[in-house]
């Protein structure tokens, strides 16, 4: 999910349990194929019956008919919009790996170390779940990048992305527990211009995407709670290209620097150096691109989008190290404003607090809503539209009561100063024992 704000904005840490192959999205040829074969044609045999016997009047021989071969299903490819479940596209449910990056320096030995390679093979189920989620994300976002246009409502864009994710994972999330098996890892964020993160339309929202907007598209897909968190930025005016390029470069720098035993502070310093080497000209004025210093990347635990570790995007962060087996969302945010965000606008994102202390609830609406959240989302983030989709109504009083009781955490939109523009790029990486895998990498970014 978008960013994990640092101490002054993050009310509490959520602690939980915890590729396109080689950067290319798979082609239709990689999908499970079954060549279509035409039915056997017996016309050639029509005149082949033997003539009647001579003087002996032998009986006419019967024509031998060839048995018809059954047609095999044609090669399956993804539809537009994406609606074909991934399980139907990949033989044996083996999904493309992400970008594989060998460790460097003191960790170089891990690439060939037999023990580390053995440990890596032990993680196959874990990796296949992540790779499936990543392939869902790639196929959905690549269609979205082609079709998002000015004039669309944010609701139309968000629901289109979310419907595709649910279809490709094979989990519509309308039955109790189904969304916990797969589907949306968190709501589709569509944060525009000075708003950097955590904005998705609530019911009745009429906001329309404009030609001059800069929109961050941040959504997650999960399989069995293995959340793939990846984001990109859409802008139609090339004047914003340097801003987008700065943030993309910073994110790739963070990915390059990340690794086992690497300190978070070192990653943040490298990200800031890359980001702030850019500037963008708007209306004749040069603006330095600034890191949004109180937004961070984060580790991801099963069913928990924000784990206990943060990845800063500026220098001076803590000395915590990344560890073997961890999963991180490396995300960076750049701004033409102050480079600092505050809570603003109407809240749409929420999540159950893992291991929250029991609190007696007096409102029956709060009790009923908590039951719905537990059965349908667990600790996965959700938004008001998701409650509407489940048929819930008149739930705001109960929802606010759960927030004030510390059972549910709200995530208001995070915004820089009005008139500024912000951009975001993000990938999920897995620190495997022998290599680093950029699980969500595609040929788009």
UniProtKB/Swiss-Prot annotation:
CDD domains: MetAP2 (cd01088). It is found in: Cytoplasm. Residues 1-86 are annotated as: Disordered. Substrate binds at residues 198, 306. A divalent metal cation 2 binds at residues 229, 298, 331, 426. GO terms for molecular function: initiator methionyl aminopeptidase activity; metal ion binding; metalloaminopeptidase activity. Residues 59-74 have a biased composition (Basic residues). A divalent metal cation 1 binds at residues 218, 229, 426. Its EC number is 3.4.11.18. GO terms for biological process: proteolysis. Binds 2 divalent metal cations per subunit. Has a high-affinity and a low affinity metal-binding site. The true nature of the physiological cofactor is under debate. The enzyme is active with cobalt, zinc, manganese or divalent iron ions. Most likely, methionine aminopeptidases function as mononuclear Fe(2+)-metalloproteases under physiological conditions, and the catalytically relevant metal-binding site has been assigned to the histidine-containing high-affinity site. Its main location: cytoplasm. GO terms for cellular component: cytoplasm. Gene3D superfamilies: Creatinase/methionine aminopeptidase superfamily, Winged helix-like DNA-binding domain superfamily/Winged helix DNA-binding domain. SUPFAM superfamilies: Creatinase/aminopeptidase, Winged helix' DNA-binding domain. Residues 34-46 have a biased composition (Acidic residues). It catalyses: Release of N-terminal amino acids, preferentially methionine, from peptides and arylamides. It is an enzyme of class 3 (hydrolase). Keywords: Aminopeptidase, Cytoplasm, Hydrolase, Metal-binding, Protease. Cotranslationally removes the N-terminal methionine from nascent proteins. The N-terminal methionine is often cleaved when the second residue in the primary sequence is small and uncharged (Met-Ala-, Cys, Gly, Pro, Ser, Thr, or Val). This is Methionine aminopeptidase 2-1. It comes from Aspergillus flavus (strain ATCC 200026 / FGSC A1120 / IAM 13836 / NRRL 3357 / JCM 12722 / SRRC 167).
